Amino acid sequence: MARANHCKSISWTYNEPTMWFEYTYDSAKLAQKNDLKTVYVTNGYMSSESLDIIAPYLDAANVDLKGMSDKFYTELCQAHLDPVLENIQTMHDEGIHVEITNLVIPGYNDSVEDLQALVKFVAEVDVNIPLHFTRFYPHYQMSDVQPTPVGTLDKAQKMAKEAGIRYVYVGN
């Protein structure tokens, strides 16, 4: 279908692609055979074994790095931070084009310390990794949290640029 519609790539997004890993793996292998690029939009929380399997067939990944504390990850995501950081590093080391998106949530991951830790991590992996800071809007189970102030996003962008990150974007 992608070739018939003259697509240049296939992206798995909106639903975590690792939740249907076998399908994305089979599709990625077919895509590569047909000269199509492949992109994961992912939370980055997958086993190292899964990443090792998909990496040869994955051209790019946008990883939603939700915060920089394990407390944040365990309380809000019921997960852990370290596997995500390790997978970002591995993707980069494997030659996968990596971009990172951080949804900045007031009172949760927007402190100067949190933002500095995120910027430091990205810069240490590679200052050429595009970094996207996006604005939180109240919804569903977090409807009591205020939208991210634009000034907070501007501050995050400034911190990232000062750390030498070359491609820093603010969105939403």
Task: Describe the residue ranges of each PLM region.
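A C-terminal junction/extension of Radical SAM enzymes
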Residues: V145-N172
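Conserved AdoMet/S-adenosylmethionine-binding subsite of the radical SAM
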Residues: M1-T148
